[in-house]
Regions:
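Structured, active/binding-site neighborhoods that engage oxygen-rich ligands
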Residues: 1-299
């Protein structure tokens, strides 16, 4: 596993931890007033993440860590094993339960097959967990695509969210082979998604690369849905193709569901720029850094 593979994983985790302080704060004026410019980790401002502290993850990052642990223990992605680990984790979870999580758990509790219990949520967050898989399938694109789609469907069984997982799996794989992020995204779009419903959302983001981030994400929508989150994530990848740290800070400053957007952008930008692009403090001050380092070293 190369430095860039490792950075793809760390970039996604750092994006989530950076988002925690202002996650789901939609009024950017409040962000400015309370924090100024968010360049490091903060305790959460909203009540959604009660009990969390600076350096922790949102519930998205927590799930990505469960995925990394499952994949590391299995030496690959085992769909049923991850489903069971995910269910067990939430049995005692003290953090926020979003609607996708609640619906998936309800389906499991109702007796559905663990791997066929996904909600119908169209939130981008289901695809955003996938960075953990980059460390496992660094040399096998088809397995990365398969695993990314399967882990998404576990909780977000929406066609466009699943297709987004495939899109990002193919894109990040190309970036890890040396292709620049925008070129990789454009080729993936042309080769595999030209007639797909997500194509227009990806293109919107790519075409906005020269525009102000806060204004652009406000226009796309700060919400969790793929309609808002996918073009937002693509904007970040295109605009900050040479500057991961600034991109993730600007993502947080744009408000709303900064975590899902940021995790995917952090993955792709990390894959391109490597570990030196991630501020050292973001690693050192991350609560789960030791555990992540241990898991990655075993792959």
């Amino acid at each position: 596993m190369t430095d860039n593979h490792t950075a793809a994983v760390w970039g996604a985790f750092a994006a989530d931890a950076l988002s925690l302080g202002v996650h789901w704060v939609y009024n950017t004026g409040v962000i400015d007033k309370k924090f100024g410019r968010v360049k490091g980790y903060h305790d959460p401002l909203t009540s959604y993440h009660k009990g969390k502290k600076a350096g922790d993850f949102t519930h998205y990052g927590d799930q990505m860590l469960v995925l990394l642990e499952s994949a590391a223990n299995a030496k690959g992605f085992d769909e049923r094993r991850f489903a069971q680990s995910w269910r067990d984790y939430f049995a005692g979870y003290k953090g926020y339960f979003d609607q996708a999580t609640k619906a998936t758990l309800a389906n499991m509790d109702a007796g559905r097959e663990l791997t066929a219990s996904g909600s119908d949520s169209d939130d981008l967050a289901g695809a955003a967990r996938m960075a953990a898989l980059v460390a496992v399938y660094s040399a096998d694109q088809q397995e990365l695509v398969r695993a990314a789609k399967a882990q998404t469907a576990l909780t977000h069984n929406d066609g466009r969210v699943i297709d987004s997982a495939e899109f990002f799996a193919r894109t990040v794989f190309s970036v890890l082979k040396g292709q620049p992020p925008v070129a990789a995204a454009e080729q993936t779009l042309d080769d595999h998604f030209a007639d797909n419903p997500i194509a227009s959302l990806v293109s919107m983001g790519l075409e906005s690369r020269d525009r102000d981030t806060r204004q652009t994400i406000a226009e796309f929508g700060q919400m969790c849905s793929i309609e808002a989150g996918l073009p937002g994530a693509m904007h970040l990848i295109a605009r900050y193709a040479g500057d991961l740290a600034t991109g993730l800070v600007e993502n947080v400053m744009a408000g709303g569901d900064s975590s899902a957007r940021g995790m995917l952008a952090g993955m792709v930008l990390g894959a391109d720029q490597g570990m030196t692009a991630i501020p050292e403090a973001w690693i050192v001050e991350m609560t789960a850094a030791g555990r992540i380092r241990e898991l990655l070293s075993g792959l």
